[in-house]
Amino acid sequence: ACLVGSEMCIRDRPKRLINFMVVVGKSEDSATRLLGDIQAELEHNQRIIADFGKQQGNASWQDGEFKAANGVKFLACGRGQSPRGLRDREARPDYIVIDDLDDDELCRNEKRVHDITDWVKEALFGALDVGRGRFIMVGNLISKNSVLANLTKTKGVHVSVIKAIDKNGEPVWREKWTKEEAQEYRDFVGYR
C-alpha cells in the first residue's frame, strides 16, 4: 500500500499466498515422495531460484516436512492420518493438495470409501485456516466408487475434467503420447 496524499509512503511486503501447505497421498510414504518433488524443485530449479531466490531453509529441511527460506511450511500427510491441530506458530494450513488418494483396494470397499470421504470433508477440510484456505484434489477417476467420485458430487465443489484424448481423438499431452499410443491405452483400459 502506498499513501501519497500526506507525502508519506508506506510500503508493505506483498502478502504470501501460501503460508502452510499440506500434501496428502494414499500413504505417508507417497505423500513424502510427492512433497520431495516440490522440495527438489525449490532446491534445483534455476528458474524458481532466479525469480524467488534460494528457498532451501537453514533449519529443518528434511523429507516429509520442511520450511522454505521465505517461511512457507510444507508437510506430508497420509490418508487417514489426523490433521487436526496442525499449525506452524500462528499459521494453520491454508493450502491442502490431495494427489491420488484412491487406489484399487480402497475402491472395492464401499464402507472404506465412505469413511475416507468423511475424513476428507470433516478432518482434512476442517484443518484449513478458516476463510483463507484452498483445497485441491487431483487424480484419475479409477472407479465410480471412489473418494474422488464422491467429492465431485459435493455441492460447492468446482470440478475440472481433463481428458487424455480431445474430441478429435488427439492426445491432449502431445509431448508424451502419440495419437496411436493414446488410442491403444484407451482401448486396453477403457473409459470410466
PLM regions with names:
Residues G64-A123:
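Conserved RecA-like ASCE ATPase "motif II neighborhood" in helicase/translocase motors
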Residues A1-G5, I10:
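Single conserved hydrophobic/aromatic residue that forms the stacking wall/gate
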Residues D104-R192:
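Non-catalytic, compositionally simple segments
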Residues R11-I18, E43:
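Post-Walker A helix-loop "phosphate-sensing" segment adjacent to the P-loop in P-loop NTPases
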Residues F20, V24-S82:
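Conserved nucleotide-state-sensing and coupling region of NTP-binding domains
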Residues V22-G25, L75-A76, V97, I136-G139, ...:
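A structural signal for short, well-ordered beta-strand segments and their strand-loop junctions
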Residues A1, D88-E90, A127-G131:
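Conserved catalytic network of the ASCE P-loop NTPase/AAA+ motor domain
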